[in-house]
Amino acid sequence: MKISANSIRTGNILVYNNDLWVVSKTPEHTQPGKGGAYVQVEMKNLKTGTKRNERFSSANYLEKAELEQKDYQFLYFEGDDLVLMDTKHFDQINISKEMLEEKLSFLTENMIVKVEFYNDKPLNIELPPTVILEISETDPVIKGATATASYKPAILENGIKVKVPQYLEIGEKIVVKTDDMTYVERAK
């Protein structure tokens, strides 16, 4: 399936130069003062693991790999693998931790994830778009900080660092985007 360069998202798997590449970083859309707009994409080769930065014109169309998606439940870690169970057929599979890279810390027991297969081989794991996590470390609340739009650093229960509004305290639960690890809102 062909997609425009502007439609490329983190986690997409592209067929580029006869290889499969996963988009590992949020693509940067750039409109220079002179010349045409382009999209800067950081990709990782699924066979070799090499990373590459590629610049595509906004007018370019790329081949997105046709993948089969299945829901799996994360059960536990086994060495360097994740053990996942198919939610329909209850089959278990082992997948390398490397597939999730820095997003591994978002994974929690019994979380439902989407595993993408290409020719019956697992290629990618998609986490839910957002997760709810507790703030374990942050600076104290500054009185009257609800009126300001400034952010302060916070460390979450899984060790990830995010910027949160000034009014949030240790122990509060927040919603965090899994694709770019940013604060969304206070959990309800």
From Swiss-Prot:
Subcellular location: Cytoplasm
One GO MF term attached to the UniProt entry: translation elongation factor activity
Domain of life of the organism encoding this protein: Bacteria
InterPro entries according to UniProt: Elong-fact-P_C, NA-bd_OB-fold, Rib_uL2_dom2, Transl_elong_fac_P/YeiP, Transl_elong_KOW-like, Transl_elong_P/YeiP_cen, Transl_elong_P/YeiP_CS, Transl_elongation_fac_P
Keywords: Cytoplasm, Elongation factor, Protein biosynthesis
Purpose: Involved in peptide bond synthesis. Stimulates efficient translation and peptide-bond synthesis on native or reconstituted 70S ribosomes in vitro. Probably functions indirectly by altering the affinity of the ribosome for aminoacyl-tRNA, thus increasing their reactivity as acceptors for peptidyl transferase.
Record family assignment: Belongs to the elongation factor P family.
Protein name: Elongation factor P
Organism: Rickettsia africae (strain ESF-5)
Upper classification of the organism: Bacteria, Pseudomonadati, Pseudomonadota, Alphaproteobacteria, Rickettsiales
